[in-house]
Amino acid sequence: MNLMKGGKADVAFVVDPDVDRLAMICEDGVMYGEEYTLVTVADYVLKHTPGNTVSNLSSTRALRDVTRKYGMEYNASAVGEVNVVTKMKATNAVIGGEGNGGVIYPASHYGRDALVGIALFLSHLAHEGKKVSELRATYPPYFIAKNRVDLTPEIDVDAILAKVKDIYKNEEINDIDGVKIDFADKWVHLRKSNTEPII
């Protein structure tokens, strides 16, 4: 990131080893935010191809906001690429993915693909004529904290989640994967890990 501060590059792309997740670094060395990878490319896609969008429940609300800006429908899926793809097919989504930098663009294929994400991001950047940091500033500035709670065998997680649902029954609740509570200006998502004893 310090290399970016020298002013010789407009953007840096960071991918994982199997190139299915994408993060960016702005020209000033600040992380763009992997939660905003999908949001940004969806903005570009929706500008040129009206349609629905999908992300998993744990992703930023910003995709919903951008989708509604175009008068389209946002849908949430359970966490996991296969769940996102299933919901995308069911809702004829034109773009989808996850807040971990995963972009799924059906016009290319139904799989997370960082190279497709890079191409869409660069196209959007060129059309907007902005610096990367300026483009990032155009999206809702949601703060996301991802915390984990280690569980012990005697903890009844399902009972805890049921109690949370009951306490917040007057709020918008989605329980397709744990419990997500949507408030007017924030949200919280509690879910059990499928691979570790954590929430």
Label each PLM-derived region with a short phrase.
Residues 1-25:
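N-terminal small/polar loop signature for handling phosphorylated ligands or for N-terminal nucleophile
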Residues 5, 33-37, 182:
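Short secondary-structure boundary/capping elements
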Residues 31-48, 52, 78-80:
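Short, acidic/small-residue loops that bind anionic groups at enzyme active sites
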Residues 14-16, 30, 37, 58-59:
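Short, contiguous, pocket-lining structural segments
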Residues 11, 49-198:
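Phosphate-binding and adjacent anionic-ligand microenvironments
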Residues 20-38, 64:
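Short Gly/Thr/Asp-enriched flexible loops that form oxyanion-binding sites at enzyme active sites
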